């Protein structure tokens, strides 16, 4: 299947996803959209992050390092690099890759959690994840050792 199936999309809001909705996207290729409430929540949370960075606030993992480096302030010009390095440090795993339906389910679950508006993710990032689901662009996800964090 090269695209989503025709019909109404599943609007995710971070609160109302059920097993039937998950299966319709994962197994049947149903399209996904973001509910207006999710867009608003994600935008509001992102503004909190942007405001904290603009104020020079100390925010763990945003303007500081992680773990034993939590007390290390990261210069503003290196904040993107910090986040990229975090992704790189978590991109390892072993085992056979998950199948397409399992991967789509994980992608939808991640999008749904981000749609709650608690993580500070950019709306554009969440929109791209939804677009990847809809265009059936799936990462290879190892069955063991993969890390998922908000």
Where are these regions (language model features)?
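Conserved, well-structured ligand/cofactor-binding cores
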Residues: 1-150
